[in-house]
């Protein structure tokens, strides 16, 4: 920790921003004094379809959000690189992110990184609160 400042790191793809992303980032920001967001690189998104919006545009959109103090692109080769560089006190995961909290904490410790991992389990209750739902609706109604 930097003095009394708590740095929180949120991670994600953030393809087609929606209220679910905002809730995740608001809840993450509430855990500390500073919110740093790591936006996934296009090439690294393998657990779901590749993003529709290119990484540079997703980074720009996330950077513009008022609850975000800083946003960076993730590393192409090492997911722990931004963690080493930015030294967060807390790393948050969204309710639907595939990574296991215990596994992540173990991997952090192996690398001498002491960040606590917190799952933001709250979900935004709306019809179009996932990028997948938005894409499906566009395909159904506009194509």
UniProtKB/Swiss-Prot annotation:
Catalytic activity: FMN + ATP + H(+) = FAD + diphosphate
Role: Catalyzes the transfer of the AMP portion of ATP to flavin mononucleotide (FMN) to produce flavin adenine dinucleotide (FAD) coenzyme.
InterPro entries attached to this UniProt entry: Archaeal_FAD_synthase, Cyt_trans-like, FAD_synth_RibL, Rossmann-like_a/b/a_fold
TM region(s), chain numbering: none
Biological process per Gene Ontology, one example term: FAD biosynthetic process
Cofactor field: a divalent metal cation
Membership in a protein family: Belongs to the archaeal FAD synthase family.
Chain sites annotated for binding ATP: 13-14, 18-21, 96
Record keywords: ATP-binding, FAD, Flavoprotein, FMN, Nucleotide-binding, Nucleotidyltransferase, Transferase
Enzyme class, broadest EC rank: transferase
Pathway: Cofactor biosynthesis; FAD biosynthesis; FAD from FMN: step 1/1
Quaternary assembly: Homodimer.
Keyword hit for tRNA processing: no
EC number assigned by the record: 2.7.7.2
Organism annotation: Methanothrix thermoacetophila (strain DSM 6194 / JCM 14653 / NBRC 101360 / PT)
Record bears the keyword Flavoprotein: yes
GO molecular function, one term: FMN adenylyltransferase activity
Disulfide-linked positions: none
Organism superkingdom: Archaea
Protein name (record): FAD synthase
């Amino acid at each position: 920790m930097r003095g009394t400042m708590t740095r929180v790191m949120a991670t994600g793809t953030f393809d087609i921003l929606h209220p679910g992303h905002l809730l995740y980032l608001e809840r993450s920001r509430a855990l500390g004094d500073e919110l740093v967001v790591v936006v996934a690189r296009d090439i690294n998104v393998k657990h779901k379809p590749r993003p529709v919006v290119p990484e540079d545009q997703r980074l720009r959109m996330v950077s513009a959000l008022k609850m975000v103090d800083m946003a960076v692109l993730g590393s192409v080769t090492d997911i722990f690189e931004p963690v080493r560089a930015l030294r967060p006190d807390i790393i948050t995961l969204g309710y639907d992110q595939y990574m296991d909290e215990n596994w992540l904490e173990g991997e952090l410790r192996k690398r001498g990184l002491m960040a606590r991992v917190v799952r933001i389990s709250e979900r935004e209750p709306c019809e179009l609160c996932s990028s997948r739902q938005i894409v499906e609706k566009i395909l159904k109604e506009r194509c």
